[in-house]
């Protein structure tokens, strides 16, 4: 069914196809790899390096390896562990739980009871209500509806593959949530299974169970009903 990919690059799931890198402080990291998931093991060290280079006139250091822009709003009940960077004009709302290795961009919303772990969140992203985002990258202006989550470990604990209609990429990774391209909309209470990659400008129906690759400019109704936007 699938073409096993070894040295051949699958263009549609590359960083260049999914993201506008001018909309993230992680641009140098993402430019150093081909596929977005290849950046996941490097997020922690990148944040520490970047954080130590930030202008202290703009970013306040709150605890070990935690840098928060002075224009950002962090509610008292939020928990933030380092390493972490919170960008300009971002809101971290009540009871948000940031477990570390989180690079959150400008003008973002990390909402009520949302949990982040080992993530790159581009500018203008909203994860506003009861979301779990782990070992994932969310592109510019993407939005996850209430209760939608990225599942980052398979139930049988085997290594994650990224699969499309005609390709199968072995990532060699046990923990891999989802890669959302720019302007992706995920409907409420959807589950993005390990290894999900959603192309830019695509919409996911509420209550969806998504796995594998969803092409850009698509509407995902269910696994067997993915239509192109017109």
Please provide the spans of the model-predicted regions:
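Terminal amphipathic alpha-helical/low-complexity segments used for targeting or macromolecular assembly
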Residues: 1-65, 201, 207, 216-218, ...
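Glycine-rich beta-solenoid repeat tracts in large extracellular/virion proteins
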Residues: 79-80, 97-98, 115-117, 132-134, ...
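N-terminal capping/interface segment
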Residues: 62-83, 211-212
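Glycine-rich hexapeptide-repeat left-handed beta-helix
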Residues: 26-27, 121-123, 128-230
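Glycine-rich active-site/cofactor-binding loop and its immediate structural neighborhood
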Residues: 74-113
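ABC ATPase A-loop
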Residues: 67, 85, 103, 179, ...
